[in-house]
Amino acid sequence: IKSSPWRGSQFLALKRLTRHRLHLAECITREKTYMISNLFLKFSELEILDQESQPFSNIFGTTSAAVLTEFFSVQDIVDASEEELLQFLAKKSRNRITNLAETSKLLKKAAQDSYRLDKRAAEPLTIALASSFNCIESYKKEIKAIDHAIEKTVKGVNPNAYMILRSIPGIG
């Protein structure tokens, strides 16, 4: 009779890690949903633009975050000179935006078409957006740490199973 050691505690650890990862992923989704409501209040037109008219490929990206948190209001974007906005976008995107002039034009157009808020509402919304960006980044870092722990645990249970799982499209 050939028997293998009982690995119930390892499976329990894996179960807890995967459930915690799901919890963190749900937290990111919830935070992004909450952030979208604040984004609509601060920069209404940016949220409702179709994909071709969007100045940013990812509304939750670094350049978008910089625009949303470093410009006090949409009026500041409208009032910014073309050169100033181009330099800002180039610096914050680390020159990764291929067509800065087009992005700047789309951003200014969206800012011009957005609703104007009372100045007293602009600062709390900017703070809330900055906080949401920080929370999302923090959750992403935690998910990376959990992924590493899951990988380590799965390799401890069965190293071959991990490689098999990674080879399946949609899972790995």
Could you describe each region identified by the protein language model?
Residues I1-I171:
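A detector of single, family-specific signature residues
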